[in-house]
Amino acid sequence: MNGQTHDPVHGARYSFQPDGENLIVDTWLEPGGALPPHFHPHQEEHWSVVEGEVRFQLGNGKRLLRPEDGEIPVLPGTKHGVTSSGDREAHLRCRVVPARNLQSFLEDSAAAAREGLFMRGGIPKNMRGARWAANFLKQHREEVVMTFPPRFVQSAMIGLLAR
């Protein structure tokens, strides 16, 4: 695996391993770290917990996941999110089918988090952050769709601020 990418806003680190047309993403969530609810229009994901425990949101349901629970499939268009629930770091592994540009999405988002452009949940901190978010959402809307703010707000923001 290659080097790690750190997202301080969401308390996450990522490592990527290409797997043909697919991608393996290892994610480490700090205690309280979270990947906010979102969905992928064209990709399926297969999540498993390597170490620790997380609250996993799938559709409208939530459940606690541990290593012994095995792999959880997430079909395209299905809302999902993950929150670390223990008092120690959680390590997850996700197989993304197909990879498309998900690695770029996570790396770009983490870089913006390190620059302080947005707060948890993707809320821009200032006008520079709002412009960044509009361009980011426009660029990656085929990879990831955030469930907040609502899509009509995202579309309006893209229309007003994206270049």
Residue ranges of each PLM-predicted region?
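Ligand-binding loop in jelly-roll beta-barrel domains
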Residues: 76-105
